[in-house]
Curated annotation (Swiss-Prot):
CDD domains: PL1_Passenger_AT. It comes from the Bacteria. The signal peptide, cleaved at the inner membrane, guides the autotransporter protein to the periplasmic space. Then, insertion of the C-terminal translocator domain in the outer membrane forms a hydrophilic pore for the translocation of the passenger domain to the bacterial cell surface, with subsequent cleavage. Finally, the mature protein remains tightly associated with the bacterium. This is BrkA autotransporter. The gene is brkA. Keywords: Cell outer membrane, Membrane, Periplasm, Secreted, Signal, Transmembrane, Transmembrane beta strand, Virulence. SUPFAM superfamilies: Autotransporter, Pectin lyase-like. GO terms for cellular component: cell outer membrane; cell surface; extracellular region; periplasmic space. Residues 1-42 form the signal peptide. The record marks N731, A732 as: Cleavage.
Amino acid sequence: MYLDRFRQCPSSLQIPRSAWRLHALAAALALAGMARLAPAAAQAPQPPVAGAPHAQDAGQEGEFDHRDNTLIAVFDDGVGINLDDDPDELGETAPPTLKDIHISVEHKNPMSKPAIGVRVSGAGRALTLAGSTIDATEGGIPAVVRRGGTLELDGVTVAGGEGMEPMTVSDAGSRLSVRGGVLGGEAPGVGLVRAAQGGQASIIDATLQSILGPALIADGGSISVAGGSIDMDMGPGFPPPPPPLPGAPLAAHPPLDRVAAVHAGQDGKVTLREVALRAHGPQATGVYAYMPGSEITLQGGTVSVQGDDGAGVVAGAGLLDALPPGGTVRLDGTTVSTDGANTDAVLVRGDAARAEVVNTVLRTAKSLAAGVSAQHGGRVTLRQTRIETAGAGAEGISVLGFEPQSGSGPASVDMQGGSITTTGNRAAGIALTHGSARLEGVAVRAEGSGSSAAQLANGTLVVSAGSLASAQSGAISVTDTPLKLMPGALASSTVSVRLTDGATAQGGNGVFLQQHSTIPVAVALESGALARGDIVADGNKPLDAGISLSVASGAAWHGATQVLQSATLGKGGTWVVNADSRVQDMSMRGGRVEFQAPAPEASYKTLTLQTLDGNGVFVLNTNVAAGQNDQLRVTGRADGQHRVLVRNAGGEADSRGARLGLVHTQGQGNATFRLANVGKAVDLGTWRYSLAEDPKTHVWSLQRAGQALSGAANAAVNAADLSSIALAESNALDKRLGELRLRADAGGPWARTFSERQQISNRHARAYDQTVSGLEIGLDRGWSASGGRWYAGGLLGYTYADRTYPGDGGGKVKGLHVGGYAAYVGDGGYYLDTVLRLGRYDQQYNIAGTDGGRVTADYRTSGAAWSLEGGRRFELPNDWFAEPQAEVMLWRTSGKRYRASNGLRVKVDANTATLGRLGLRFGRRIALAGGNIVQPYARLGWTQEFKSTGDVRTNGIGHAGAGRHGRVELGAGVDAALGKGHNLYASYEYAAGDRINIPWSFHAGYRYSF
């Protein structure tokens, strides 16, 4: 029984002496947890008990009635439960915890002070109210904590109505603690809980329900909320409160242009941890920090706002500018969602207003709503945050400020990581008007019709390591926005855009930047940035548009323009021109202008400049066969030293040779142009060309440089030469047949390997080198015949040649061959052998064109070789011997037609070659113990090529074969028969001639004889 406990304890509770009256608690009962109060309220009051403790307050007295649930009714000027350190009001010590108390307060007389349900005042004064109810539906103040007092509300329900003042905690050391329960009320502009002048409020897992006014106000105090929910319902058509009169004192409710569920005034601090906050109705706002020193921190949780012209999170003064600017909001891991036209997720306004947003999601659903809006000096930093907007005209980030003369500095946004996505029509990923925005590692994408990734009117946009992309419009749009600016604000408007550190920008309609106004625009691409799309302006008038572009440090722009006033290409900067373009002033500072290679059926392009200076590279495409090419035209003064890199489609000029005009000048200035191609020459089809100026017309044209072959044609001619490979294969087998003459045997299996370096010079092509290596295996059988011995066998071999075309590149030949042979060794020293070999060869070359590109080709041919060799071995004293020999060889390869990767057409005729060789071997046969034999020798010979009929044609131009040539050959080697059936050989050779030199040739082999 509460009253029994109450009588047993000293008390300072002040009870009005007027008779108890029952209150209709319909509004309170409608709130959660209030229905249980109805039975107690329905009971009639009992007669007073004689001798009950009481105290006097405001001249009114009251008495308790003996009940389980005590009901306290408080009227104007009254206090329901008072724990006060004022000597005039001090009574006996109150119980530390009161339970199941039902307090009703009213404020009827505007000339009187409002009634107070609970008041705790004074250091050391503490009271806990549990499981109780405070009804303020008729006005009044539910609770007051001041002067260092402490009040704890545990599971308490507070119901407020019109005229209710907020529960207030004020003064340093004062604490109001709310755990669980429901706090609700209808109090326009007043609030449910107010912390002032250093007071502290802590709310845990409670439900706050505010109608037509804020739930929390921190005005010089601090409020901490953990868990639970906050709801504010503004109702339909709710107007904002009027501004305060000049000189009027600051009231409990703020004179603002918006009402928020949570307010932080001057030096007020509010922290919300994992709180679900909802605000409903026109002009509703979630949280609002609006004065110097005010701070609101959201950690986790959600903010949901429904209604037009509101906001989710706001920092800074309102549009009325009635208060000094200031306010800071911090969000970490929070989700902010708005569903209303012109209702921003985060709004920061004023020079001293700040927002810090980390790991947060910001969403807006209706038209003209921004994910982040920084206005009039406000500053916002975002880290790893996702912004999503869906309405027409919505903006992911809006930066709006006035000119300095308007009294406000520029606003700014700094965002690192995360993304910005807009899906509405006529929307913008970022909108910039007199301010600055820096995006680092942020992906910005605009999906809707007429929507741009960036819409700019004035200010600076820096995009680093991120992207700007528009699905249906230009990536960047520059436009006037007079509705967002004060009069005269456009007078000094400029737009600066800088993409750096690998940032990308691309418009879905093929436009990178669209200029809708005469605002000067400066675009800079740096440090690997890439922009794709054209730069265009309404009317395509470059002088009116005032657009300048600079590209440097590995950055590139792929697009065309007719409106650039100036373009500067710094070191490492590239402009890829994909259509006819015009620039008023071009300054080359080590950069590169590259004409995009035309697609099939596409026309070549012309870049027209009014002036040109500096130094740089121009990359132009040509098709000499069609007489078409890209052109650079300078209509005014041209200065500087420039280089021209020419890329050809692979066609061939007519018989008169190519004279394609690449660069056209007016003869004004000192500009010079030279080829940037390798060797200062251009490969065009079969021939090489140089660049020269016509002194009369001042046109720089390509002219054929004599009979020099292009790199591709040179490789095609040299690749067709297989006779040198056939000679290397034949030489390997010669060693095997020579070994048969060492001693008679029944034949057997054998294996040989060889490698030799060849330096070859063709008559109509440049010299090249190749290393030919191979492996052969075979099996033969020997039998005795009249006057000698016969051998017959077969072979299988693989050959690999690695070719080097000096200054151009290289190639490879891979061949497989099979063959058969027969040999006769007479008893009188005569011998005769013949070989037939059939092969298949895969020929490849890969060379560097003079334009820096690669030219490749790969084709296959077949070949056949037949040789006949004869000689006689003369035995000399002391086991010396001399062996003269002669050989004839026929070689034929099939023809082939193919096209190289650059379009060069190649026709290789079938080739027939005839060779003859005369030679002499001189050596000594050395018999060793056990029947072993070692035979060292030296060799001298001459090889002559008598005929070569195969020609090579490139683009229809013929190149004759190598013709007659010869070479001298020197060599040394050793043959050995060791043990039973084991035979080894090794040799070295050198050859020199007018067409082929062999600096070294090594052979080694083994056979086993039966």
